[in-house]
Amino acid sequence: DQPGIVEKLAGTIAAAGGNWLESSMSRLSGKFAGLLLVSLPREHQSELLGALEALQTPTLKVSVEATGITVDDEETGSMVGVEIVANDRPGIVEEIARLLASAQINVVSLETFCESAPMSAEPMFHAQAYLQLPEATSVETLTELLEQLSDDLMVELLD
């Protein structure tokens, strides 16, 4: 991030009559990235698109996509937050993602990082995920499925 980028985006959205609904922003490997969900009257869409394109520089890229959905779209099933910790290894995210997809579990948000274990300094994989479970899938079933991936994988429910 550079000081003022978020402020410029917020001001541009507000000036076009938009409402900043949700966002996820993070700095990763020296780059700042963000996803935004904005509600906006249809008649202001081209105005906002032009204003956002005008913000672009060699170091600031903006991509806009209309979702065609409303914020109040119904989602079935329950939401659950989980923290997953395991020994890090190549492919661990793919293993988890494959398992979730095969169980028809939707990943709403996912944050991952690795850090050294306190005593051994071995790399440990950490994930915090918010998942939308199908109506027929219980939290207990989710936990059992995840823990079957490997003996070292631990799952904790988040509040």
Question: Positions of the model-derived regions?
Answer:
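A conserved regulatory-domain signal marking ACT and ACT-like small-molecule sensing domains
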Residues: 1-159
